[in-house]
C-alpha cells in the first residue's frame, strides 16, 4: 500500500513542484490550502495595496493551487487558520513591536501554523507524512530527525524552521530541499504547472506585501519622540520607535539637517524615554556587539557549551560563536569578532556544520560587558 502524504499547497511554484515530486516518488498525495489572513476581519486597511483589488491575493493563490492540484490529479482541501494565526502569530508580532523589538513572523508562522495547526488538522486524514515546499532537508536515518540546510544556500530556510521541536519534524518531508531554485522552475515548466513563472511570495508571512509603517498603524498608535545622537544632541522628531530597527538607514530624513555628509543609521532605542538614537557612518562602533542573551530556546539533541556557528538574521553569513547555557531555555552567545546590528526580537539560529540544532530569541545585546540601548 502506498504511503500517504498531506502537503501544504500554497499556490506557489515551490509547493507545486514538491507535490509533483512526491507523486513521482510513489506516494498517495493529497493537498491542503491554508487561508490564514482576512483583511476585513483583521482590520487590515491602512498600508494595504491590494485593498481594492477585485480578487484578494489569497483567493488568487487558492485558484493557482487548484489549477496545480487538478493538473496533478490530486485532491485539494481548504482550511482556515485565521483565528489561530491571529492568536498565535500576529498578536505576538504586535506585542513585540509594542515592546520596541523587531520580531520575525516567519519563524512563528512555521512553528505555530505550518507545523502545529496544520499537523493537528492533518490527523483526521491519518497521513504517514506531511510535506511542505521549504528549502531545507531532513535526515530521518537516525533515532531523531535532523534539520539540514538546503542545497541552494541562497534559498535555505532552516533559519525560519529553527524553532521547531524534534517531534514536529518527525514525520515531515521537504521534497525540494535537495534542488536549486532554478531546477524547481525548470521542472515546473517542463510539466506545464500553472505556477511555473509565478513570482516568489514576499512580505509578511501569509499576509503579503504591505506599506509597513502604515500597516502597523492599523494596530498600534504612533508615538512621536526625540531623535538624538548618543551624546544627547537633538536632531529632529521621530514618528514612533516601532518604525525603526537597529542599523536602519532608510526613512530617517536627516539629510541636509546636519553638517556631516555621512549617511545616518539607527544605533539605539530607549523605550523608557521614547528616544531614537542615530549616528553617522555604517561602521559606527555602537552598532557592534560581542555578546547576546538568547531566550526561549528550542534545541534538538544534547545541550552542550562550546563552539558553533550562528545566523542572527536570515541570509547572514555564518558567524563563529561560542555558547554557554544558563538554564534549559537560555544561553549566552559570544562572538569576539564583533557583529553589526544584532537586534533584539530577531532569532539567533545555531548550526553544527550543516545541521541546524536550534535557536532562540535575541533578548539583550552587549559590547565589552555593557548593555546596548537596542530596546
Curated annotation (Swiss-Prot):
GO terms for molecular function: ATP binding; tRNA binding; tRNA-uridine 2-sulfurtransferase activity. Belongs to the MnmA/TRMU family. The keyword Kinase does not apply. Residues 104-106 are annotated as: Interaction with target base in tRNA. One of its GO terms (cellular component) is cytoplasm. HAMAP family: tRNA_thiouridyl_MnmA. It is an enzyme of class 2 (transferase). Pfam families: tRNA_Me_trans, tRNA_Me_trans_C, tRNA_Me_trans_M. The record marks 134, 346 as: Interaction with tRNA. Residues 155-157, 313-314 are annotated as: Interaction with tRNA. Gene3D superfamilies: Adenine nucleotide alpha hydrolases-like domains, HUPs, Translation factors. NCBIfam families: PRK00143.1, trmU. ATP binds at residues 8-15, 34, 133. The active site is at 109 (nucleophile), 205 (cysteine persulfide intermediate). It catalyses: S-sulfanyl-L-cysteinyl-[protein] + uridine(34) in tRNA + AH2 + ATP = 2-thiouridine(34) in tRNA + L-cysteinyl-[protein] + A + AMP + diphosphate + H(+). Catalyzes the 2-thiolation of uridine at the wobble position (U34) of tRNA, leading to the formation of s(2)U34. This is tRNA-specific 2-thiouridylase MnmA. It comes from the Bacteria. It is found in: Cytoplasm.
